[in-house]
Amino acid sequence: MADPLGKILLRGARRLFIWPLEAGLVLALYGIARVLPLPVASAVMGMLFALVGPMTPWHGRARRNLNLAMPELDAAEQRRVLAGMWRNFGRVIGEFPHVHRMVGLGRIAFEGQSNLEGLENGAFLIGAHIGNWELGPYAAIGVGHKVAAIYRPLNLSLIHI
């Protein structure tokens, strides 16, 4: 059985030391992406995450999940999929500060947006974390609906962008 006191101390140390460093890094990346033009922010963050992502503990989890979902992939195909995942995730992060402008710039089109027109009693829109998942609510906003989001807060409570 794991040492409960050790786990509590480790969790406390992470909150005191690691979380503030992580929050600072995230806010710095957000600030950099915000001042860069949208295409540059997307490309730079995509390249950065493609480089750094495979060195994180999350890469192992992604590989295990990929093995469960697609066991037929060989090692080269797995590397290709995982590299694409990190690049896409970085691009999403790079685009995040610009999301509110992306629709207005004509870069985004919503397939099936007309299905939202005329709804009078509200609706649930459920989206997966595929592509830039932050854009989903703009489909409803674009046809004049109010939007409320239900989500799980970040584990890193120091960040509320």
What is the role of each PLM region?
Residues 149-153:
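Short internal beta-strands
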Residues 35, 142-143:
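Alpha-helix C-cap/termination motif
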Residues 159-161:
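Conserved small/polar residues in nucleotide/adenosyl-binding loops
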Residues 146:
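Residues at the starts of beta-strands that form the adenosine-phosphate
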